[in-house]
């Protein structure tokens, strides 16, 4: 079959190959055509660098596929840059390259202006004037690229283990967006995350600005152990609302959830269970409210007592 090999200069080479050919064989064919020694060749397909011992069929390279040929500079090295979207960019660099140089290479590949790039390695943000060797970044190291959005801000998320995560966010980001960023960094599924700020649990559909979360604010991350539960809230009109809660949720949290669903301000809500009015600071487990329990909602009229 025929495949194409595109070089960084834009030249396209056509090769006759078999699916069973190894990458090593392909590099030998390129040497025959172009005179480039195999040890200076790097072949990329679908964003992956191809390994010498594997075959074209291992990588699902079919007829008329296009490989990309990158020259491995003597003394140069490859590093990877992973974005928050999960895309991995491969760069050819020298240990003596500055972070500024690396950002320029990323701009060449991806079109992202250097002033919007933040590069992270081993949990540290890298400074423009320092070099890769200053940070002990070696061949095949992976850097993380975070975009510094215009008008964006940094916030911190502290876990129960005491670890602090730094996030780049916008005031207009929803709590759902923030949980997705935490998943990208830490691998924790959003449905297991509960975020707390100023003592309140944050609801997915609301934004950071709704909660007056500003730059360098610290949120607290509590893991929602599988074992969240559903409860029902019945109003005097006979309507039943379903809520997702934790036994550790306070009555105040529950009223906030009702407000999000129904628009009723918490100060107008009275919740009754087993004949008792529930107090804001107590938790569902304090009242032995279990999954599929039904609470009753009575409206406290303005001026009422």
Swiss-Prot record:
One Pfam match: ubiquitin
Coiled coil ranges (UniProt) are: none
Spell out the disulfide connections. none
Location in chain, cross-link Glycyl lysine isopeptide (Lys-Gly) (interchain with G-Cter in ubiquitin): 6, 11, 27, 29, 33, 48, 63
Q: Name one GO molecular function term.
A: ubiquitin protein ligase binding
* Entry keyword Methyltransferase: no
> Entry's InterPro entries?
Ubiquitin-like_dom, Ubiquitin-like_domsf, Ubiquitin_CS, Ubiquitin_dom, Ubiquitin_ubiquitin-like
Specify the Ubiquitin-like domain's residue ranges: 1-76, 77-152, 153-228, 229-304
Sorted alphabetically, the Gene Ontology cellular component annotations on this record are: cytoplasm; mitochondrial outer membrane; neuron projection; neuronal cell body; nucleus
Q: Where is this cross-link: Glycyl lysine isopeptide (Gly-Lys) (interchain with K-? in acceptor proteins)?
A: 76
Q: Which SMART domains match?
A: UBQ
UniProt-annotated site: Essential for function, residues = 68
BP terms from Gene Ontology: energy homeostasis; fat pad development; female gonad development; female meiosis I; hypothalamus gonadotrophin-releasing hormone neuron development; male meiosis I; mitochondrion transport along microtubule; modification-dependent protein catabolic process
The site feature described as Interacts with activating enzyme is recorded at 54, 72
Tell me the outcome of changing residue 65 to A. Answer: Non-phosphorylatable. Reduced phosphorylation of human PRKN by an insect Pink1
Keyword terms of this UniProt record:
ADP-ribosylation, Cytoplasm, Isopeptide bond, Membrane, Mitochondrion, Mitochondrion outer membrane, Nucleus, Phosphoprotein, Repeat, Ubl conjugation
Give the Phosphoserine positions (modified residues). 65, 141
Positions of the propeptide segment: 305
- List modified residues, type ADP-ribosylglycine: 76
Q: What SUPFAM superfamilies does the entry give? A: Ubiquitin-like
Does the UniProt entry include the keyword Acyltransferase? no
Protein family: Belongs to the ubiquitin family.
Q: How does it assemble?
A: Interacts with SKP1-KMD2A and SKP1-KMD2B complexes.
Other information: Ubiquitin is encoded by 4 different genes. Uba52 and Rps27a genes code for a single copy of ubiquitin fused to the ribosomal proteins eL40 and eS31, respectively. UBB and UBC genes code for a polyubiquitin precursor with exact head to tail repeats, the number of repeats differ between species and strains.
This protein is called: Polyubiquitin-B
Q: Which organism is it from?
A: Bos taurus
């Amino acid at each position: 079959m025929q495949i194409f090999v595109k070089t960084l200069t834009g030249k396209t080479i056509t090769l006759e190959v078999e699916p069973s050919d190894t990458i090593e064989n392909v590099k030998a064919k390129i040497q025959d055509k172009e005179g480039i020694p195999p040890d200076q060749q790097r072949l990329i397909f679908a964003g992956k660098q191809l390994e010498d011992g594997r075959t074209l069929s291992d990588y699902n390279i079919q007829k008329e596929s296009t490989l990309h040929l990158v020259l491995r500079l003597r003394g140069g090295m490859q590093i990877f840059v992973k974005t928050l979207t999960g895309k991995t960019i491969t760069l050819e660099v020298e240990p003596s390259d500055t972070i500024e140089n690396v950002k320029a290479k990323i701009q060449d590949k991806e079109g992202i202006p250097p002033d919007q790039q933040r590069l992270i390695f081993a949990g540290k943000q890298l400074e423009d004037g320092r070099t890769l060797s200053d940070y002990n970044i070696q061949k095949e190291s992976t850097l993380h690229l975070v975009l510094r959005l215009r008008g964006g801000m940094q916030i911190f998320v502290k876990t129960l283990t005491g670890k602090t995560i730094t996030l780049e966010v916008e005031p207009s980001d929803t709590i759902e967006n923030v949980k997705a960023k935490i998943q990208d960094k830490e691998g924790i599924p959003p449905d297991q995350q509960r975020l707390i700020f100023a003592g309140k649990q944050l609801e997915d559909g609301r934004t950071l600005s709704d909660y007056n979360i500003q730059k360098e604010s610290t949120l607290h991350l509590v893991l929602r152990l599988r074992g969240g539960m559903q409860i029902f809230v019945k109003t005097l009109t006979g309507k039943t609302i379903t809520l997702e809660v934790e036994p550790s949720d306070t009555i105040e949290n529950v009223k906030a959830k009702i407000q999000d669903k129904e628009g009723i301000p918490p100060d107008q809500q009275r919740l009754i269970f087993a004949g008792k009015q529930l107090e804001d600071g107590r938790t569902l487990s304090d009242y032995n409210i279990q999954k599929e329990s039904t609470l009753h909602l009575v409206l406290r009229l303005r001026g009422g007592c």
